[in-house]
UniProtKB/Swiss-Prot annotation:
Protein name: DNA dC->dU-editing enzyme APOBEC-3G
Reaction(s) the record says it catalyses: a 2'-deoxycytidine in single-stranded DNA + H2O + H(+) = a 2'-deoxyuridine in single-stranded DNA + NH4(+)
Residues the entry annotates as binding Zn(2+) 1: 65, 97, 100
CMP/dCMP-type deaminase domain sequence ranges: 29-138, 214-328
Species the sequence originates in: Gorilla gorilla gorilla (Western lowland gorilla)
Keyword Acyltransferase: no
Length: 384
């Protein structure tokens, strides 16, 4: 049966927004897709030219999907405004399906004066490899304009609440676990799109000098291997990087350490219980006491997963942090200090280096050797 939706609406009810834009990664019975859009010129001083809502059903004919409804409207509207360059922003409850994703890419290729930013509350069929490839084709800028896709964070939810909801001047109240779900989806989208770190971020945060100032973030690069015929085989789709969520970042009041964000995402990989896996992490700081405890619990409960950690620096190697590292090692994790080999591997694998080779900084090997000795003393419970 053809969905009976009006072409556009200007606002939705509060319960409708909270129900359909809930960002829990896996949700059932959310078959209506809501697409809130804004169209602006390239002049940032000018207000949006149009801002409304399309909606459609996930399982209906393609022409009834909200993405296609938008392009049907926009194409006709665009004929009257051919000379202008436009920035289109979508806030959408589900990321576009495979066919819509390909149609979006085609549209943008045919109209280079339009740029599209897509903020999604949830990822649609993120485990499907064909869908992942469609998203990469849409978002990776190889031969022309493409879309930028991001996960909605608190700021985007707040914006939609103010712009597209009958809020009656009530403030947006986030649901439980909104920050955690955001980080999970952010990591998964990064895996799919194969995001890379920019070179200054890597060299600044992974510098292994003994005393560094202003390095308050922890970056964690990871890769996963599966044992096959006594050989470790790299799983390219399970590779990425993340950093800790600092308090108040992206509008979230509470922070979350990088290691805990990483542990949150592993269950969504659905690793086969009958296969053996090796997870390798390259971190700018070794885990704090609490994170080390949680990682130790994880590998103690997941006998088919082994964990290797290479740290650029040792975090607060006094007291409980030392105890945490020992607990983690006793649980079976292999903890080491990054050497030139690991720094180069991270540069080659996780950094958008554009063909530039890794250039070690002064003192890299000396710092690495000193930190390795210090780590061994900690793990062997030797005195300071």
């Amino acid at each position: 049966m053809t969905p009976q939706f009006r072409n556009t609406v200007e606002r939705m009810y509060r319960d409708t927004f909270s129900y359909n834009f809930n960002n829990r990664p896996i949700l059932s019975r959310r078959n209506t897709v809501w697409l809130c859009y804004e169209v602006k010129t390239k002049d940032p001083s000018r207000p949006p030219l149009d801002a409304k809502i399309f909606r459609g059903q996930v399982y209906s004919e393609l022409k009834y999907h909200p993405e296609m409804r938008f392009f049907h409207w926009f194409s006709k509207w665009r004929k009257l405004h051919r000379d202008q360059e436009y920035e289109v922003t979508w806030y959408i409850s589900w990321s576009p399906c495979t066919k819509c994703t390909r149609n979006v890419a085609t549209f943008l290729a045919e109209d280079p004066k339009v740029t599209l930013t897509i903020f999604v509350a949830r990822l649609y069929y993120f485990w499907d490899q064909d869908y992942q490839e469609a998203l990469r084709s849409l978002c990776q800028k190889r031969d022309g304009p493409r879309a930028t896709m991001k996960i909605m964070n608190y700021d985007e939810f707040q914006h939609c609440w103010s712009k597209f909801v009958y809020s009656q001047r009530e403030l947006f109240e986030p649901w439980n676990n909104l920050p955690k779900y955001y980080m999970l989806l952010h990591i998964m989208l990064g895996e799919i799109l194969r995001h890379s770190m920019d070179p200054p971020t890597f060299t600044s945060n992974f510098n292994n000098e003994h005393w560094v100032r202003g390095r308050h973030e922890t970056y964690l690069c990871y890769e996963v291997e599966r044992l096959h015929n006594d050989t470790w085989v790299l799983l390219n789709q399970r590779r990425g990087f993340l950093c800790n969520q600092a308090p108040h970042k992206h509008g979230f009041l509470e922070g979350r350490h990088a290691e805990l964000c990483f542990l949150d995402v592993i269950p969504f990989w659905k690793l086969d219980l009958h296969q053996d896996y090796r997870v390798t992490c390259f971190t700018s700081w070794s885990p704090c006491f609490s994170c080390a405890q949680e990682m130790a619990k994880f590998i103690s409960n997941k006998k088919h997963v082994s964990l290797c950690i290479f740290a650029a620096r040792i975090y607060d190697d006094q007291g409980r942090c030392q105890e945490g590292l020992r607990t983690l090692a006793e649980a079976g994790a292999k903890i080491s200090i990054m050497t030139y080999s690991e720094f180069k591997h991270c540069w080659d694998t996780f950094v958008y280096h554009q063909g530039c080779p890794f250039q070690p900084w002064d003192g890299l090997e000396e710092h690495s050797q000193a930190l390795s000795g210090r780590l061994q003393a900690i793990l062997q419970n030797q005195g300071n």
